Amino acid sequence: MKKSFTLIELLIVCTIFSFFSVGIFSFFISQVHLQTQTLMLQQAFSELSFALDKMSREIRMAKKDDIEYKKVTKNCSGDLEGTDKLNFWPIPDGISFRDYENRCHKFFLQNNQIFEEAQPDIPALPLTSTSTLIIQNLRFNLTGESQNDGKQPKVTILIDAKIKGKYEMPLKVQTTISQADIDFEY
C-alpha cells in the first residue's frame, strides 16, 4: 500500500500556509507605511531644525536699535512709539530687530511658511517649504527687550506645525535664545 496525504491534511497545510503568507505580507506592508511615516517626520524635523538654527543665530547676534554700531546709527523700528533702544519688537505673526550687519531683520509667518527678511539686502525668503510641513502658528515671547528693565534680552520661539500628507501629525517645538551682548543702558 502506498503512503499519501488525505484531502483534509492537504487543506489544513494550505490553510496554515495561507495564514503565514497573509501575516508576513501584512507585516511588510505595515513596515512600508511605518518607513514612509518616519521619512516624512525626519524631513519635517530637518526643516524645523534649519529654521530654528537660522532664527537662533540671527536673534542671538541682534543689536540694540537707535544706537551707534560700526559707526552707523540705525532705526529699524520706524516711528513706533516706545521703541527707542529696544533689542526686539513684535510685528504681526513675527519679530523684528537690528542684526549685527546693521540690517533690519524680520522673521514672520506667511502662507503657512516661516519667512526671513533682512532689508535692504535680502527680500522675504521662506525658511520652510509647504511640501511636507504646514506651520500653523509662530509666536515669539519677548523678555527683557527694553533697555531699562534690568533683564538680559531673551526670545522664546514657539512653533505649532503639522506634517502634510497622508500621515498628518502635529508638531510643537519651543526654544529660548538669549542675546549674546550684555544688556546695559546707553
Where on the chain are the PLM-derived regions?
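Short, hydrophobic secondary-structure boundary micro-motifs
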Residues: 20, 67-68
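A generic fold-level signal
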Residues: 2, 47, 89-90, 152
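Type IV pilin-like appendage domain
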Residues: 68-148
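Aliphatic-rich helix starts adjacent to a transmembrane/signal segment
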Residues: 2-56, 60
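Short linear sequence signals and composition-biased patches located at protein termini or domain-edge surfaces
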Residues: 124, 131-186
